Amino acid sequence: MTEKQQIKMVVFDWAGTTTDFGSQAPVDVFDRTFRQKGLVFTKAEINAPMGMEKKAHIKTMLSTEKGRKLWEDAYSRSWNEDDIEDVYQCFEGNLRTVVAEYSKLIPGVRETVEKLREMGLKIGSITGYTSEMMQYVLPVAKEQGYEPDCCVTPDVTEYSRPTPFMVFECMRQLNVYPPKLVVKAGDTVMDILEGKNAGAWSVGIIKGSNVVGLNEAEYNALDEQAKKELHEKARKIYLDAGADYVIEDITELPEVIAKINESL
């Protein structure tokens, strides 16, 4: 008799999922970088491609009608690939100075990961940050009690979300297969698409997410009705992207995994 299959691994995103409540670091640094180049985008416009590799994020924003116009107004010409590289290098420099400051764990992460490990699961992690950027984040997370079994970045796989290759690399490093025994948990549409493209289970987390986009103080200042409205909006965004499950809080994840295990 074959043993019943169970989920073997959870792959977490970083900013907005396990650290940096509201995914504030990339938003703030993108805003600072674009302003240094004479370009002003709204927070919503910066958030729209969030979850992509950062150079691809910059190119996506500058490829919009507004992005092209802002660039042409500032420089009297269209942008080129050298310009994308220049903006990216500026972004990296800005992020390097602040990323560790934004690496506080989101409430419930440490306890949830401990419970998942007790359930026998491996913990993978992936991010839109580069390996160099993560050198500043990983030690700060470890000091707070969070140390995933692996951390995969876009420069390792050469491709970022929504491709599945960072999930596949976690599977390779931790010897986990097939994809249906993997849960991808994140806080952006790109996270959901990445999980689906990998053939894994995709779970969207609302509290602390980029989709909600508020820092911890802003979120906690909301009344219950305002929180409920934001949660419903975020839930719809995740479900429209194809999420298998949407949870309000990361602490609900072990229960979701138990439900998935029952269905396998």
Predicted regions and their residues:
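N-terminal helical cap/lid subdomain that shapes the substrate entry/recognition surface
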Residues: 4-110, 114-119, 135
